[in-house]
Amino acid sequence: MKIIVFSAPSGTGKSSVIRELLKQTDLNLAFSISTTSRAPRGSERDGVEYYFVSAEKFQEKVKQGAFIEWQEVYAGNYYGTYSSEIDRLSALGKNIVFDLDVFGGINLKKHFGDKALAIFLQPPSLEELKKRLEHRQTDTPEKIAMRIDKAAYEIEQATHFDKIVVNDNLQVCVEEVAQLIRSFLNH
């Protein structure tokens, strides 16, 4: 079992890249479902994209030591990875894919060391990222401004990752990342 960690600013296309990679059966990937205290967006379902819990329940699980990593990503919105989720996917003999915020990604890379490939997906520019976030129509202008400010900071952290890939074109990005993963899995 190997670990592939993806981190990126919100709106970079991380979920789309991961969705395409999971279709490539030769990579033997399984998606680690994170737990969050935020409300579901759009068509998100509990146990598919995330495990949705209250902030109180999340804090209870933190105190119980249930998470291998966790962060308060936005005020009052917690994200984390249950240790039991890694055990579940490991038992299936899969390579595990994580979709984490920047600090969660850095922490997981430190935890797993050479067993993990940490990939930072970067938008072509902050202007393009703003357009993508506006097109998504899930956030207020204030929330988009907050996400752009956070993205600038996250991009500064990219050097902590093994590889940085710019997502300017989904198919090109997916192929580039698939090659990185194949190379990692074969070593």
Kindly label every feature range from the protein language model.
Residues 23-31:
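Post-Walker A helix-loop "phosphate-sensing" segment adjacent to the P-loop in P-loop NTPases
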Residues 97-101, 111-135:
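Conserved phosphate-donor/acceptor-positioning beta-strand/loop module used by diverse small-molecule
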Residues 12:
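ATP-binding Walker
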Residues 18-19:
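Post-Walker A alpha-helix
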Residues 36-96, 102-106:
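ATP-dependent small-molecule kinase phosphotransfer cores
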Residues 131, 135-139, 153-187:
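NTP-dependent small-molecule kinase module
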Residues 15:
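Walker A/P-loop
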Residues 7-9:
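P-loop (Walker A) phosphate-binding loop of NTP-binding proteins
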